[in-house]
Structure formats: structure tokens, C-alpha cells
């Protein structure tokens, strides 16, 4: 079979989209490259895409299923990823297709049955990462954690961190690693690093592929947005409780209350269930919701900060972010 690598800027994208629709899939807009395979009539019969380090939109013509062409396709996609220096790969798929990808060298690391399973191309990488986290473990009765995007870092983020530190012996701070925000991962990490420089008893972790970003979670094979969101919540929170929290000895997770975004509010509710109530082979984690900090009678949020930044409302911006963020934005030419 002849394979071809296609960037999403090429005209052939419409043919790929048609083929995906024929296989009950939608085109995922985050895909940067496709690998497609043609039959003797130069018709697309297999395809798969690469978005960052996630393989997406794998489709195989019904006539070729079970023929071994899936292994050829995945091999081509893995070769492409290695060429792009992306050796650590993930696949989200329906549970009924997990066996297919396991035969291609992928291993299940989390699931949201009966809708989604998450696989990666290593049998030991997650275990090795947990071993690294175990070396960062800090003794204490109350070990806290926060996961944040910080797009950008605001006084609200700083307040949440301060409140958490008052309630625990040590705090682990995780940053969502994907570059799917207005500010890049590097920018967000540096703003947080500068914004907490004066605080002690805190470990700032670099971005991890095992902190799942909602922005990169696929929805191309799930028809219902509610099911997509709930599957994301489950996969992300189970990874956190079963692996990250166990390795670091985390006992508490802190989060700001959410009044404006229904999806984030539901994530907070699901957090109580998956971290505290659900029965699984891992200690329960106490979820603590901290009321959001306000400025001028308005809740401080990163979205409001981005709005002030876009509208060049410098005075209002200064009320919502610490001086370290202001200095960083100015240094980077954001205002």
C-alpha cells in the first residue's frame, strides 16, 4: 500500500474529511499532519492524524479491517512522530478498538468506560514517571496539590496558592503542559515561577503529559458533548488519583469555586466524586474548594485579564494580576 504524508494546509484535506465522514468520524481541527493510504485506484482507504503527540482520526475502510493494514498505518504515524521529535505518543479510542491499538504496541493507562480508553506507546513510561515523582515526595500529614492553566497568572491564582499553603504542610503545583492557550506553556510556567518566588513549602512541577488538557481531548468520535466532557473528567481524575497522587503522597487537592463556566463547575463536581467518593485501588483525596478572590467587586479570572489585555485596559489589568505578571507581559511586548 502506498502511504502519503499530508499537512492540513493541502487541498487533499477535503478528501480526508469525506473519508472520515464515511467512517462516522469528524475532522479534528487540531491535527497538523495526516498519513493516508491509497488503494490501486488511488482512493483513500486508511488515514490517521497527528496533533502534537496524540494520534487522532484513525480510520480504515471496512473492506480492509482485520487485514493488518492498521499496523502499517500506525507504523507510518509513529515514524512521522519520531521525525518531528515526538517519541511519546497517545491514542484515545473507543474500548472496542483498544485491542487493535494494543497489537500496534500501545498500552492502556486510563479509561472512561464504555466510551473512551487512553493508550500510550510504552509499557513502562508511566511507571518510570511515577518513580521520579516518588523521589520528589515530601513528608507531611497534609500534602496539597493544585492543577492550573494560568493563562495568564493572576492574583486569583496567587490567592488560591496562598490559601492552600495555609492548610497543608507542602503543596505540589502542576501546570497544564499543552500549548493550546493564548499564552504558551513556557510563558505560563515562567509567570507562575516568578509569581510564587517568595513562597516556601511548594514544588512547581513542569508540565506532564499525564495532566490531561481539556483543550486537546478529542471529540471527533463521540457524538454527545456531555459524554465527551464526562469522559475527559474521568480519565484525567483517575490518572491523577491512581498515579500522580499516590506517587507524591498527595492528600488534598485545592480548586477555586466556579460560578461562570458550566464545564469547569461540572469538573469541580466530578472531582469530588472521582477523588473522594469513587471506589478504586488508591487512597481518597480531600477536595477543598476555595472561594474566588475578587477585585472591584468582580471575580478575578484569567479570561477577564485576557479581555482587559486585548482592550488595553491597563488600570483594570493591574488590579487583577501581580506585579510579576505585569512586568512579564511588558517585557514580552504584550502591552
Curated annotation (Swiss-Prot):
This is [Citrate [pro-3S]-lyase] ligase. The keyword ATP-binding applies. The lineage of its organism: Bacteria, Pseudomonadati, Pseudomonadota, Gammaproteobacteria, Pasteurellales. SMART domains: Citrate_ly_lig. It catalyses: holo-[citrate lyase ACP] + acetate + ATP = acetyl-[citrate lyase ACP] + AMP + diphosphate. Residues 1-131 form the N-acetyltransferase domain. It comes from the Bacteria. It comes from Haemophilus influenzae (strain ATCC 51907 / DSM 11121 / KW20 / Rd). NCBIfam families: cit_ly_ligase (TIGR00124), cyt_tran_rel (TIGR00125). It holds the Pfam family Citrate_ly_lig. GO terms for biological process: biosynthetic process. It is an enzyme of class 6 (ligase). One of its GO terms (molecular function) is acyltransferase activity, transferring groups other than amino-acyl groups. Its EC number is 6.2.1.22. Acetylation of prosthetic group (2-(5''-phosphoribosyl)-3'-dephosphocoenzyme-A) of the gamma subunit of citrate lyase. Keywords: ATP-binding, Ligase, Nucleotide-binding.
Amino acid at each position: 500500500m502506498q502511504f502519503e504524508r499530508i499537512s492540513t494546509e493541502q487541498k487533499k484535506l477535503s478528501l480526508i474529511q469525506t473519508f472520515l465522514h464515511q467512517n462516522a468520524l469528524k475532522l479534528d481541527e487540531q491535527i497538523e499532519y495526516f498519513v493516508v493510504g491509497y488503494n490501486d485506484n488511488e482512493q483513500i482507504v486508511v488515514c490517521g492524524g497527528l496533533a502534537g503527540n496524540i494520534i487522532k482520526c484513525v480510520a480504515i475502510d471496512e473492506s480492509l479491517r482485520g487485514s493488518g493494514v492498521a499496523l502499517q498505518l500506525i507504523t507510518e504515524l509513529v515514524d512521522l512522530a519520531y521525525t518531528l521529535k515526538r517519541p511519546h505518543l497517545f491514542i484515545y479510542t473507543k474500548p472496542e478498538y483498544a485491542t487493535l491499538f494494543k497489537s500496534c504496541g500501545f498500552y492502556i493507562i486510563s479509561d472512561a468506560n464504555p466510551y473512551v480508553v487512553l493508550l500510550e506507546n510504552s509499557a513502562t513510561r508511566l511507571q518510570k514517571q511515577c518513580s521520579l515523582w516518588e523521589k520528589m515526595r515530601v513528608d507531611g500529614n497534609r500534602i496539597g496539590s493544585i492543577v492550573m492553566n494560568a493563562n495568564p497568572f493572576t492574583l486569583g491564582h496567587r490567592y488560591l496558592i496562598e490559601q492552600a499553603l495555609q492548610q497543608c504542610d507542602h503543596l505540589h503545583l502542576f501546570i497544564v503542559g499543552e500549548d493550546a492557550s493564548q499564552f504558551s506553556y513556557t510563558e505560563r510556567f515562567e509567570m507562575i515561577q516568578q509569581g510564587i518566588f517568595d513562597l516556601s513549602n511548594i514544588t512547581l512541577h513542569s508540565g506532564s503529559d499525564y495532566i490531561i488538557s481539556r483543550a486537546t481531548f478529542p471529540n471527533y468520535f463521540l457524538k454527545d458533548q456531555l459524554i465527551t466532557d464526562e469522559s475527559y473528567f474521568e480519565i484525567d481524575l483517575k490518572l491523577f488519583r491512581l498515579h500522580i497522587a499516590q506517587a507524591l503522597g498527595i492528600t488534598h487537592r485545592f480548586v477555586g469555586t466556579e460560578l461562570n463556566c458550566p464545564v469547569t463547575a461540572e469538573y469541580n463536581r466530578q472531582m469530588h466524586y472521582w477523588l473522594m467518593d469513587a471506589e478504586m485501588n488508591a487512597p481518597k483525596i480531600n477536595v477543598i474548594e476555595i472561594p474566588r478572590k475578587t477585585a472591584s467587586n468582580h471575580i478575578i479570572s484569567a479570561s477577564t485579564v485576557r479581555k482587559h489585555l486585548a482592550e488595553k485596559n491597563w488600570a483594570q489589568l493591574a488590579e487583577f494580576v501581580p506585579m510579576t505578571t505585569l512586568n512579564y507581559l511588558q517585557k514580552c511586548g504584550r502591552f
